[in-house]
Swiss-Prot record:
The gene is atp18. The keyword Transmembrane applies. The chain crosses the membrane at residues 13-32. Belongs to the ATPase j subunit family. Keywords: ATP synthesis, CF(0), Hydrogen ion transport, Ion transport, Membrane, Mitochondrion, Transmembrane, Transmembrane helix, Transport. This is ATP synthase subunit J, mitochondrial. It comes from Schizosaccharomyces pombe (strain 972 / ATCC 24843). F-type ATPases have 2 components, CF(1) - the catalytic core - and CF(0) - the membrane proton channel. In yeast, the dimeric form of ATP synthase consists of 17 polypeptides: alpha, beta, gamma, delta, epsilon, 4 (B), 5 (OSCP), 6 (A), 8, 9 (C), d, E (Tim11), f, g, h, i/j and k. One of its GO terms (cellular component) is mitochondrion. InterPro entries: ATP_synth_F0_jsu. It is found in: Mitochondrion membrane. GO terms for biological process: proton motive force-driven ATP synthesis; proton motive force-driven mitochondrial ATP synthesis. Its main location: mitochondrion. Mitochondrial membrane ATP synthase (F(1)F(0) ATP synthase or Complex V) produces ATP from ADP in the presence of a proton gradient across the membrane which is generated by electron transport complexes of the respiratory chain. F-type ATPases consist of two structural domains, F(1) - containing the extramembraneous catalytic core and F(0) - containing the membrane proton channel, linked together by a central stalk and a peripheral stalk. During catalysis, ATP synthesis in the catalytic domain of F(1) is coupled via a rotary mechanism of the central stalk subunits to proton translocation.
Amino acid sequence: MSFFGLKRYSTPILKPMLPFFLGGAIVFYGTVKLRDAMMDSAEYRNDPRNPKAGKYGSDH
C-alpha cells in the first residue's frame, strides 16, 4: 500500500531508540529532584526568586 507515494517498510524505530528515551527520562527525573532539593535548601528558602518562598513561614 502506498501513502502519498511512500512505501511501508518494517524499519524498527522504537526498539533502537529505547535506551535514549530511557536515558532522557532518567536525566529529566534527576534534574527535577536536584532542582527541588536546591529550592528547599536553607540558603534559598527565603529568596524572593524562589517559587516556593511563600510556602515557608518566617521561622525558617
